[in-house]
Amino acid sequence: MSKLGGKNKKAFADFVNKLKALGADIQQAEVNVVNKATAAAKEVTLDNTPVKTGTLKGRWADIPLIILNGKISKGYTNNLYYAGYVNDGHRTVNKSGETVGYVEGFRMLERGITRGRLAMRPLMDEEIRQIKRKTGF
């Protein structure tokens, strides 16, 4: 996935502070939120991936969750050689190599990343509500 920026970074810091105040397992809560946000992002990416033969759509694979120096990272990837052309668009050429047109990209990955970022705040709020229910606050 992509890095948190701006409002999401501040929201995540507020989320951690609230978890500390509740005495919750912060790392587990962060892992839960990251897993759910990545799943939401991947779902939108899959929905926006065009289906011609199904090969491109079937090649989306999860990148395992990694915790390194207190930072949590998780994502998904598509290693099919033409995935970038479908996502970003590409030029079309004639037999002599001249550009004769351009095929717009589907931007499925960007749509998924946007969905993942937008899902962060509600997921953090839901995680705090669940912890409050468990701890009796």
Located regions from the model:
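Short, Lys/Arg-rich flexible segments
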Residues: 1-83, 90-137
